Design a protein with these regions (language model features):
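Short, conserved beta-strand edge motifs with alternating hydrophobic and charged residues
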Residues: 122, 154, 163-166, 172-175, ...
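A short loop-to-beta-strand structural motif that recurs across blades of beta-propeller domains
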Residues: 42-44, 81-83, 129-132, 171-173, ...
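Short loop/turn segments immediately following the C-termini of beta-strands
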Residues: 38, 77, 118, 124-126, ...
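Beta-rich, blade/repeat-based domains predominating
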Residues: 16-30, 57-76, 80-81, 100-119, ...
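Blade/loop signatures of beta-propeller domains
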Residues: 1-10, 30-31, 40, 123
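Beta-propeller domains
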Residues: 34-53
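A short beta-strand motif characteristic of beta-propeller blades
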Residues: 11-16, 50-56, 92-102, 139-145, ...
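Short loop/turn segments immediately following beta-strands, especially the blade-tip
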Residues: 175-181, 273-276
Length: 276
């Protein structure tokens, strides 16, 4: 949808076509790729030869991360919970459910942990969206609220900054951290606008960070992912061929997995981008 920048820098390949819209991409140490299918109620695993199997059952899984011990944390929108599965896909427990520090959350969407194992996750609602915090020892707090549909969330490598997509503002926020609290909030980047001008075509979704500290954004409705410099400058836009681009993750420094689809609840797809 956008004029692509540096088209000789990458290739785009569809590696899966599926009945349901996909989300929550994550890669393990062996190179296996995991993703969720929301309405399909499954966490899926793609192994060698791009073979896809159901790895775990989950009511309405969205964002997903893999921890160092191999456990998966998954946002379940229907249950209003962040759920933990072991490395074999066996459900362990709900880490947090329905309430955070006494306040209800209704749409857990995406999540990230810091190096100490503290969890931050977005509650994606219009105008009153928030970021919830759950410490490794079980303490809860509302980290930030009053956001217009907070979505993808990622730390800088030194964890001085927390980035969050504010979907209905079509922008990425940059939060300065101070002892796990908010020191300051600023606009990191305003994203390109879809030619239609419709809000639903201008929704930044999942985020990822590369080894150089560049922030990558899945731009839902715009059929694109964008690469932003550590200063928030647009460096690259890629047409993913899939209008509802939901999320992305790095398998290695040259390979990106992108989830999303052509409608909700489906059909969905998974794409692989090779950076040259």
């Amino acid at each position: 949808m956008f004029n692509e920048i540096n088209q000789d820098y990458y290739t785009v390949e569809e590696i899966a076509s599926l009945p349901f819209y996909t989300e929550g991409p994550a890669a393990d140490a062996e190179g296996n790729i995991f993703f969720t299918n929301l309405s399909g109620g499954s966490i899926l695993k793609m192994g060698s030869g791009n073979k896809i199997t159901e790895w775990a059952s989950c009511d309405y899984p969205n964002g997903q991360i893999i921890l160092q011990n191999g456990d998966h944390l998954v946002c379940d929108v229907k249950l209003k919970a962040v759920r933990r599965f072991d490395h074999k896909g066996r459900f362990i427990k709900n880490e947090i459910e329905k309430y955070c520090s006494g306040k209800e959350f209704t749409s857990p969407n995406d999540l990230v942990t810091d190096k100490e194992g503290n969890l931050y996750f977005t509650d994606s609602v219009r105008d009153k969206g928030k970021i919830c915090y759950l410490s490794a020892s079980g303490e809860q707090s509302i980290f930030l609220e009053g956001l217009d549909y907070p979505n993808g969330i990622i730390f800088s490598h030194d964890e001085r900054w927390l980035y969050v997509a504010e979907s209905y503002k079509n922008r990425i926020l940059k939060i300065e951290m101070e002892r796990r609290n908010v020191a300051a909030v600023s606009v990191f980047a305003e994203l390109p606008s879809h030619p239609s001008g419709k809000k639903e075509n201008n929704l930044p979704d999942g985020l990822a960070i590369d080894e150089d500290g560049n922030i990558w954004v899945a731009h839902y409705g715009s059929q694109a992912i964008h690469k932003l410099s550590p200063q928030g400058l647009l460096l690259l836009s890629i047409d993913v061929k899939m209008p509802l681009t939901s999320n992305l993750c790095f398998v290695n420094s040259h390979t990106i997995i992108v989830t999303g689809g052509y409608g909700e609840p489906g059909p969905g797809g998974v794409y692989k981008i090779y950076l040259k």
